[in-house]
Amino acid sequence: MSVKDQLRLVDRPWAVCVVGPQEVAVTLPYINQVQFISVESTMKLKRAIKVGCKCFAISHYNGELFISDIATVYVYTIAGALTRQFTWETSGDRLFADIRSTCVSSDGKVLYVADKNKGLIAVDTENGIVIFKYSDARVNEVCGICLDSYGNIFICGWSSHNVLQINEHGEYTGETVSSMDTLNYPQALCISRYSGRMCLFRWGDNGLMLDLKH
């Protein structure tokens, strides 16, 4: 991997997601702002919206932004209007405790949330009702999450130093990367829809590029 371009932002960024063919959205949680950046030949700031929370994780589907602070997911339009939020379970308990990253299913019906304290949580994108939860001793402090083109879910464990694969029903299907592979404190991951390769990013270190086999 090599640096193709860089853009200095007005404050510290946290997360990024694709919102168009040549456009991404970046969260700046410490100024409650989402910036939209063109990524054509060079990166350029297009516009920004203010949100009513410390915006950490972000995902996009069909003109909607799923933005989270530590314990709530807020759904905004691309124009910056808040439409709904997910904070509580039907039981009255809090849905989330420490949200680190999110992603949306290919059909837009499910939001997958990586929660450092609670594990993987899947909720309905319309009403926030829990579809499934996944946590076990094989993964600790879930930080990163992504999907492949087959609908498989991949989560990385910060302190378990690994990556697990989960199916769309919330069932464990395997360990993609183990702590024996010298993966130290993974924070984020993504999969290229074109090459099928996984990019893993570790705390205070360079990224890793892995070829996945199906």
Which residues does each predicted region cover?
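Blade-level signature of beta-propeller repeat domains, shared across WD40, Kelch, NHL, RCC1
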Residues: 184-214
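Short loop/turn segments that connect beta-strands within beta-propeller blades
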Residues: 1, 38-42, 77-81, 125-127, ...
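A short beta-strand motif characteristic of beta-propeller blades
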Residues: 2-8, 43-49, 82-94, 129-135, ...
